[in-house]
Amino acid sequence: MTENSAPAAKPRRSKASKKSTDHPKYSDMILDAVQAEKSRSGSSRQSIQKYIKNNYTVGENADSQIKLSIKRLVTSGTLKQTKGVGASGSFRLAKADEVKKPAKKPKKEIKKAVSPKKAAKPKKAAKSPAKAKKPKVAEKKVKKAPKKKPAPSPRKAKKTKTVRAKPVWASKAKKAKPSKPKAKASPKKSGRKK
């Protein structure tokens, strides 16, 4: 039984090698298809598949391979997705400057994937803005509370004014006493005028 399984694996490998010689890499074929279409909005996955099937001899699993290679090209930055999400939507070639920048980014992404601790930190950072939002709500409540307090506080102030008014009357009475001698002095002046 082991002898039968070993020879079965060898022909599969030879078929795979034959397929690879029939056509170039899927990424190269996709780039050719996008360049051939030259549409401003970008070329769709369906149009890319049609172009590849018409111009190259491809196997039955070509559609799934095209999807995977499109996703790889988008993540690497060689293709830019204009519409849709994932492998669906429209794609166009990225400019030379855009291609160079994303080419450096995948290396950093690989490092992040290796260290899951770094990936956990952004999650904490995402939680912290939510915490920051909660204190803002609390601050609004605090601000509202003082607004309610000033309305009753003038009433209290009025009560205190009435209490203070009594000493004011006493001070007025004291001021009234010195004014009496002035009144006495004023009749003398009137007498002199006569």
From Swiss-Prot:
One of its GO terms (biological process) is nucleosome assembly. Pfam families: Linker_histone (PF00538). Keywords: Chromosome, DNA condensation, DNA-binding, Nucleus. Residues 1-29, 96-194 are annotated as: Disordered. It is found in: Nucleus; Chromosome. This is Histone H1.0-A. It comes from the Eukaryota. Residues 102-164, 172-194 have a biased composition (Basic residues). Histones H1 are necessary for the condensation of nucleosome chains into higher-order structures. The histones H1.0 are found in cells that are in terminal stages of differentiation or that have low rates of cell division. SUPFAM superfamilies: Winged helix' DNA-binding domain (SSF46785). Gene3D superfamilies: Winged helix-like DNA-binding domain superfamily/Winged helix DNA-binding domain (1.10.10.10). Residues 22-95 form the H15 domain. One of its GO terms (molecular function) is structural constituent of chromatin. Its main location: nucleus. The keyword tRNA processing does not apply. Transmembrane segments: none annotated.
